[in-house]
Structure formats: structure tokens, C-alpha cells
């Protein structure tokens, strides 16, 4: 009988098999993790380093061959001294070193001046920019209250409640000149996705933050591209395959003036080194129904889009501006002239744009504000107002103290202009999250506090208080007294830190 020939697993075959295994692992990782193929993407560097380590480890392991029923080691004649081994070892070291150096050279430690100049600040006047308008445009709810209304609305819809849930987006937007929150529905679970994927998500919820009217908007054609879908319809995968080099920031759910749902996908831009100085470079609008995407420069973004820059990004950029004036070391040790934002923010609607409001306080003395800033979420335009007064937390405590016998809790305040006086306005909620009263607190003097069961009652009481304290503008008060209905204060888009 002819003796069976032994099949040796040669070095070339081992390398070929190694390449195939690595490519398969890389494809699986890419499909699941969806890293942007961009030199500025830290996740891509980690991915490449991981692959290099895997290749090196597999190559360095002892190789074997299978011959019949016996296993014999293959002699690679000094494998660990080969050029391939040395190259792979060097590759791992070089990638790791490049990532470390790139991270260091991108940090505020070395680039404090560049970070401090990322945001341009314009000084302005409060009464000039913040006009007074009617109450019907003032939101009376915060996000948590909107969530309660959304859940109640969903619970009343028998035909949908068993298949869908309310997503937790609740994006704050201006819709036809009114402050509203919008959020899509989502599949209750994976099984519900399989049974409903053909039709898609049939509706979204819209809540008027001024009137508290909650509406389920049914769509003629369902949404098929969302973060709640799977496989090719999973929103992030859909975007990644269309834009493989784009690094997306937070994705926001909005509707255009016709009520069509879109995903506003801001594209990160790194301005300092490889990984530092993040702002926004472009905006991709993805139609949630059709999946059609359009790519815009930030300055060309359609006017109906309200959020290009997230509030957190704008706050971080201002903190760089306020703390790094005299370098990084001063921001940690001496802290001379260091200013920082307070621990909350809110949204104001001005000229159909949404602006982020937050107070500004000294790092060394954070019990009062030295001013506040407004930051445009669509353009990053930033205005600073030098107004000393109470921080928001103090105003909230004062308002709660006014009704301490009832145990109500204040929402994060809105900033209003009443009789040329900067004023904190907030809702007072009971333990179940329902709004029971409203409060106004003077920014300059947080001991001046007015409450009321309605906004009109609260405002009337507040006007009386500031006038009795010799504050406010007589001219503005006379204008207000001629109105027989709603009072006049600045249109604000209510929000709390998400």
C-alpha cells in the first residue's frame, strides 16, 4: 500500500491563514463597532493597534503541523529573529507611540492658548438682545414633565402600546415659532422589530411646551432608519457605510416645518493636533423615513435645524475660554481670572434660533454669577453679558423656600427679561413631577421671590415686588400695564441638563 504523504503547514501557508483570520475579525469588528476611517479618530487608532497586537501574537506563537495522527512542531529556523517578526514588533511599538504622542500633543496641557481661542466671545447688552414677548411662547414644562406627558399619551393608544415604546429623545426645538419637544416611538423589543419592520415606526410624539398639548403625529409612511432598527437600517450603520470617514457627534431627532422627521447628524472636526479642539465641521441630515442623506457645511445648514452644536460641547468650549486665559498651569494652581460655567444650562429661543444659556462664575468664588453667556446651537455664535447676581442653584433654593410647607421642587430656571430686570423663572413641581406653581426670582437680588398658581399671577406679584424695591424700568412697566391679556417676557425654550 502506498504510504500517505505528510502535509506540512509551511510558513507561507501560516501567514496566509493568519491574514484571512485577521481580515475576518476586522470585518466583524467594523460591522459592529463602526469606527470612522479617519486619522483623527481615536477609536480607529485603538482598532489598528489591536489588530497589530493580534497579528504579532499569532505570528509569535509556536506553529504546528498535522501529519496523520501525530502533531509535530514546525521548525522555522529561528523564527523570532526573522525580518517579519522584527517588523511586526516594531509596528506595534510605533503605533502605540504615535497614539500616545498624538494624544499628548493634542491636549490643553501643551495647547492652552489654542484651546482658549476655539470660541469667539462677543460682549453684549442684556436688554438689547433679550426683548420681551408674550406668555403663549414660554414653555412651562421641563424635560421630565414632558416625559410624563409622553408616557401618558402612549398609554392611551391601545393599537400601538403593545408594539412600541416612547424613545427618550425629547429634543427641544422651535417648530413654527413655538417651543416643542419631539421624540419618536421605538420598537418594544427585537421580536416587535421583526413583526413591524416592514411598515417601520409609525409615529412620533410632539409636545407643546407652552400649552402642554401632547400630540401623536402619525406618518403616512413609517420611519425605517433609526437607532432602534437593526442590520442595514440601524441608523449609525447606515450613516457609516455612506460616510466611512465622518466622525459623528451626538445625533439629534428633529422635524422640519412640514413635520417630516429627520436625524441631525453633526460631524466632528478636530482643530488641534490629532485628537484635540473638537468642534463641528459638517452636518448630515438623514430622512428617518427614506434614509436619504444630505451633507452640508455648517454655514449652509437649513434654517429649520435647531441643533448643530450640542449644549455640552458649547459649555466645554466656553470653559476652555474662561479657564485657560493665563495658561494650563494657572487653571490648576493660581486660577487667576479663571471663569467657569455654573452646573446647569437652559435654552432660549431668539430669532428662530436656539441659544444655550448658562451662568458664569469665578472658580475661586462660585456663590454668585459674574455674568452669563448665550451660545447659538446652530452657528456657535457666543455672547457674554456682564451681570452680577445669584447663581441658579441659589435662585432655586429661594423659590423652594417660599413654598417649603408644600415640599415643591424647582426646575432649572429660565432667564427672562421683565421690566429690564434679568429674572429667573421656574416651575415648582410636586413629588409626582406635576407642575403646581410658578416662581420668579430676581437675578440681582435672590431675596426678591414671587410665586403664583398661574404665570400671570406670578408675574403680577413679581412686578409689584421689584417696583416696591425701586427696581425695573418705569417705561416697560407702563407698556405692560396697557396689556389686558398675557404679560410680556422673553421667549425661552425650557430645558434641563439631559
Where do the model's predicted regions map?
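Soluble extracytoplasmic regions of secretory-pathway and membrane proteins
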Residues: 2-498
